[in-house]
């Protein structure tokens, strides 16, 4: 066989032309130090702030400190088997979590991975955990209510859709109970809920999930969990993950409610990370950007206008506004609301609900102190009937607390003062409410109407609860149409007032409590 040199050269040329250089450019570095969940990496170039760094064993760390010759990163998960000299590489990605309707009814960790044993989640995509909040032009004023189901809150400290209302108090004052009841009350309202548990015991969270399931609210709720035993990085990021899951509904013209339980533990986790990264400590050893930690999170709770929703959905959803309402929880130490983190969050939010240990221990539950609790924007969103009827409730309670303190020193009181004290006592008693028993707008309206129009005057203090229960049972059976109208419209006019008065007059005649 004779070889033709021309054919050989043509074949070689053809092979050379077809040859493709396949090269993978990887930004790789070496771990130079590992301690307490923090790794220091040398040799990485082009790293972004907050970028995910791939570690051995299919784990990730997040780059938080970008220094001249090294990168400080916090490990997302266990770190005991990491060692100096191991290779790591950049991913070019910022941390993202799954979002969508498939998360409703599920319990997930900070990274959006299911931990409830119900199989994989059918998500609609991914969203970055850190998102810039909507601007001023994209927002709409708050004018629709979020009913918590608590008389004390809905009448005196109303919450609107898109508002940030802080729940603050010492440990064991009913903060979580109030937030969980608010979630339970949304099961028929169309508001989707996200409950973020930060730094709590796994048994406590399991109990919350069980209660939500028992009351039919879990199907409407996403539970995001970062327990006390998990890495500080996961506790720090959990609220941001939950917020991204809630924003999915807001940006599509729906309403969502998110509870952060609690942001004190998130601040402690962030302080731990910052100190380990050797960032300079400030007041109470918190880093200088702890205000920004919470402000950038809570500013994402907002009501957005129809133009924003239409633009976000590429015209699929038109003429609908969306909202994300936040109920951040802060735990105080011995009632000290002037500590660093509480004052920060008070200044960021649109109002606060103060829960007091003394009130809780005296049997007043929810233990709301109406004197120092406030809602800065909720008044514009309050249901008409409750707004009209509850005007005197806050005044009555404030005057009662003042007079009760004064009457301890005064021996004889005039009739007007005594009447005020008695009215205040009855209103205080009426504001008591059992856990897991949120009330409808109509039920609240009937109770407040009875207090405002003097129907409690002849009722003994220890019978107020029985009086209310019997009254609501009577009104819902004998005046079902009136109650249905109030629930559907929320209006207050002469017909509704006449119907309530007639119903109460007839009930009082029966003396069946």
Swiss-Prot record:
- Keywords per UniProt: ATP synthesis, ATP-binding, Cell inner membrane, Cell membrane, CF(1), Hydrogen ion transport, Ion transport, Membrane, Nucleotide-binding, Translocase, Transport
UniProt xrefs under PROSITE patterns? ATPASE_ALPHA_BETA (PS00152)
SUPFAM superfamilies referenced in this protein's UniProt entry, alphabetically: C-terminal domain of alpha and beta subunits of F1 ATP synthase, N-terminal domain of alpha and beta subunits of F1 ATP synthase, P-loop containing nucleoside triphosphate hydrolases
Tell me where it resides: Cell inner membrane
- Reactions catalysed, as given in the entry: ATP + H2O + 4 H(+)(in) = ADP + phosphate + 5 H(+)(out)
Q: EC number(s) for this protein?
A: 7.1.2.2
Site positions (Required for activity) are 373
Among Pfam families, the record links this protein to: ATP-synt_ab, ATP-synt_ab_C, ATP-synt_ab_N
Annotated CDD domains:
ATP-synt_F1_alpha_C (cd18113), ATP-synt_F1_alpha_N (cd18116), F1-ATPase_alpha_CD (cd01132)
Q: Which Gene3D superfamilies match?
A: 2.40.30.20, ATP synthase alpha/beta chain, C-terminal domain, P-loop containing nucleotide triphosphate hydrolases
Which terms does the record give in the GO molecular function aspect?
Answer: ADP binding; ATP binding; proton-transporting ATP synthase activity, rotational mechanism
Q: Which residues form the signal peptide?
A: none
Give the UniProt entry's GO cellular component terms. Answer: plasma membrane; proton-transporting ATP synthase complex
Q: Which residues bind ATP?
A: 169-176
Record membrane topology: Peripheral membrane protein
Listed under subunit, the entry gives:
F-type ATPases have 2 components, CF(1) - the catalytic core - and CF(0) - the membrane proton channel. CF(1) has five subunits: alpha(3), beta(3), gamma(1), delta(1), epsilon(1). CF(0) has three main subunits: a(1), b(2) and c(9-12). The alpha and beta chains form an alternating ring which encloses part of the gamma chain. CF(1) is attached to CF(0) by a central stalk formed by the gamma and epsilon chains, while a peripheral stalk is formed by the delta and b chains.
Give the family this protein belongs to, as stated in its UniProt record: Belongs to the ATPase alpha/beta chains family.
The UniProt function text for this chain reads: Produces ATP from ADP in the presence of a proton gradient across the membrane. The alpha chain is a regulatory subunit.
Q: What is this protein called?
A: ATP synthase subunit alpha
**What does UniProt list as this organism's lineage?**
Bacteria, Pseudomonadati, Pseudomonadota, Gammaproteobacteria, Alteromonadales
What gene does the UniProt entry assign to this protein?
atpA
């Amino acid at each position: 066989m004779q070889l033709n040199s021309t054919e050989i050269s043509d074949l070689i040329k053809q092979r050379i032309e077809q040859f493709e250089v396949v090269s993978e450019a990887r930004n790789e570095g070496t771990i130079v130090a590992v301690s307490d969940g923090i790794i220091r990496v040398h040799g990485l170039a082009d790293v972004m702030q907050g970028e995910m760094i791939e570690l051995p064993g299919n784990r990730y760390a997040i780059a938080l400190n970008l220094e001249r010759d090294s990168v400080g990163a916090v490990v997302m998960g266990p770190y005991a088997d990491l060692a100096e000299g191991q290779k790591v590489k950049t991913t070019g990605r910022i941390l993202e979590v799954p979002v969508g309707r498939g998360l409703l009814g599920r319990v997930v960790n900070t990274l959006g991975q299911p931990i409830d044993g119900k199989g994989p989640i059918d998500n609609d995509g991914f969203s970055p955990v850190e998102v810039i909040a909507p601007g001023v032009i994209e927002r709409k004023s708050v004018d629709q209510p979020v009913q918590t189901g608590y008389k004390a809150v809905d009448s005196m400290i109303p919450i609107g859709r898109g508002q940030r209302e802080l729940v603050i108090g010492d440990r064991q004052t009913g903060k979580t109970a109030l937030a969980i009841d608010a979630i339970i009350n949304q099961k028929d309202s169309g508001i989707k809920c996200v409950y973020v548990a930060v730094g709590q015991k796994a048994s406590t969270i399991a109990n919350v999930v069980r209660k939500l399931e028992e009351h039919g609210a879990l199907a409407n709720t996403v539970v995001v969990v970062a327990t006390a035993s998990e890495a500080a990085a996961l506790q720090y990021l959990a609220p941001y993950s939950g917020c991204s899951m809630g924003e999915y509904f807001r940006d599509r013209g729906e309403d969502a409610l998110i509870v952060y339980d609690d942001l004190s533990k998130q601040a402690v986790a962030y302080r731990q990370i910052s100190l380990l990264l050797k960032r300079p400590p400030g007041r109470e050893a918190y880093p200088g950007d702890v205000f920004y930690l919470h402000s950038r999170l809570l500013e994402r709770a907002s009501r957005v206008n129809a133009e924003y929703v239409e633009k976000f959905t590429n015209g699929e959803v038109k003429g609908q506004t969306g909202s994300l309402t936040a109920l951040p929880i802060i735990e105080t130490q011995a009632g000290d609301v002037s500590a660093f983190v509480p004052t920060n969050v008070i200044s960021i939010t649109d109002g606060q609900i103060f829960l007091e240990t003394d009130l809780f221990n005296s049997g007043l539950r929810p233990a709301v102190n109406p004197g120092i609790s406030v809602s800065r924007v909720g008044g514009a969103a309050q249901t008409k009937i409750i707004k009209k009827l509850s005007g005197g409730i806050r005044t009555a309670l404030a005057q009662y607390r003042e007079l009760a303190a004064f009457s301890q020193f005064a021996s004889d009181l005039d009739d007007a003062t005594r009447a005020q004290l008695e009215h205040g006592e009855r209103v205080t008693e009426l504001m008591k409410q059992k856990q897991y028993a949120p009330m409808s707008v109509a039920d609240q309206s009937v109770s407040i109407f009875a207090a405002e129009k003097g129907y409690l005057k002849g009722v003994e203090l220890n019978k107020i609860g029985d009086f209310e229960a019997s009254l609501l049972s009577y009104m819902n059976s004998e005046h079902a149409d009136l109650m249905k109208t109030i629930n559907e419209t929320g209006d207050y006019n002469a017909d509704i007032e006449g119907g309530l008065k007639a119903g109460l007059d007839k009930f009082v005649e029966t003396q069946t409590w």
